[in-house]
């Protein structure tokens, strides 16, 4: 096999070695696989634990330990249980797994064989036997890598060269266990997922359960967010070294099997076949603070572009501090940075079109009525069903990044903006290890989130500005869509995930999770029993949070929770009879109808003092109630300037002036007429 052959040479120059002065400085094995079409697995090198000083052989699933080939670098014979091991030869010595002592002269090495059981396996080998160049620069694309991918049955899904391997991620790139992007030499189906070239290897270093992303992606797909990335947990080996449990996912990209919309980037490139877009000078607003400059864009001067530039666009909400690192994008007039993932190098016309479209949508969402100054409703710009579903994912998961970063939207040609694909939940579901988290399942998250310090000079008004999910809750029709989706769709998907699917994930991953915990020293112990107990405790944090979250949303995610509001009622003049001024009753931005949506009752509304108005919902608003008050004044009372808008206070002032004028005229007439009365 191509990968296996290269693995041996990689081991020789860059495997996992003991100190070079050690009598046994390297040790590696290769086991036969049990799959129908696989004859050998990749090479696995030993790894030394700083916790107990032992060397671990983390073996992939489907390993036949009864037929292991060993390779080593030693100064003398290598003995195990009184039997000499032959370099490059097969042995049955390790058939039952467990702990063994290797000896070279007087030096002894304890080697522990651990076995994954049900996960697919990926072996990658780099041409120089290391990852130093990638780790020094995550954007560096390593060429000449090879990959062997074995599915959960041990059969080969891919055995060929990679086009490239590089680093990925923002905060996750700073962890010891690194995430990567790989690009295959040709499209392939990996582990039952749809055929593609580009894939992501997520490390999930901060997620001790290793399952947060997988759980939430599964629910996203179940509720109908069709662009949700498919994913599988795998064991990853690079140059023979076990890297732990990774989550291989479909990349967020425009592709027939990913985000299936018109590829504007490809169409633009086709019209400029000899142009390297990355060499073009950047235009617009760039630099360190460009992500904080409202109503700005960044683009490239591209000679030719398609006639139709209405799509497709793949966009991501991003932090202002990260925005300068991206090629193209725009910042809305309310300081929301939006980067273009595709087209990565956008023309000025493309940026002006999509930023203008987004701005009109934002204006409509920010308005009290849901309509912008052009008279267009926000639902004319964004697909409200995907918008509601993505909100529910962000809310239910307790995602700290909700509406801040890793939130994607896309727009097809002549279509509306759609929400998705969902992405990046390793810090969700009460992951206190990640630093930023929502730990209380009984509080709102996405519904109340604001923009994240995106303004220049720490503009506090921006920090208090609702982000895109919170904006939806200004509008009754959005809340109704969310409520309907929760009751008829999301709740059942969440229950199914928590009550059935998670058990399947655990069964598949638990053995590998123990290996991963030892490899990355999660619990400062190598005891399998202690690690298993700790792992299940960490997993319980996730399931307890999501279960409580489900209960909280089931009780509170309803339009009735938003309440009714009654318009300000100006002070009224005493007439001696009941005073029943006209009122406007709303639920969010929806004006309700008396007798259909509510009943109204007045009390203490005859004599001078404070009258009370009570509105009781009916029909769709049954169970909702609101109260307000207004003042009843005598003519001689001073004007009341409290409450209401400036316009309402002006009207009240005029009404009071009119009332006093009429009363004054009546008083004068009374004294003129009085002498003639007998």
Where in the sequence are the language-model features?
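Middle-to-C-terminal accessory/interaction subdomains
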Residues: 175, 336-422, 426-560, 643-650, ...
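Beta-rich interaction/scaffold domains
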Residues: 11-119, 559-646, 650-652, 656
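Short, well-structured beta-strand/strand-turn elements
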Residues: 223-235, 399
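Conserved oxyanion/phosphate-binding beta-strand-loop segments in alpha/beta enzyme cores
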Residues: 143-203, 347-353
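Gram-positive cell-envelope targeting signals
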Residues: 1-19, 657-678
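Internal "kinase-insert"/substrate-recognition segments embedded within catalytic cores
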Residues: 188-189, 203, 224-229, 241-392
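Short, solvent-exposed loop/turn and secondary-structure capping segments
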Residues: 134-137, 193-195, 212-214, 246-248, ...
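N-terminal module-boundary/linker segments of secreted carbohydrate-active enzymes
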Residues: 96-98, 109-156
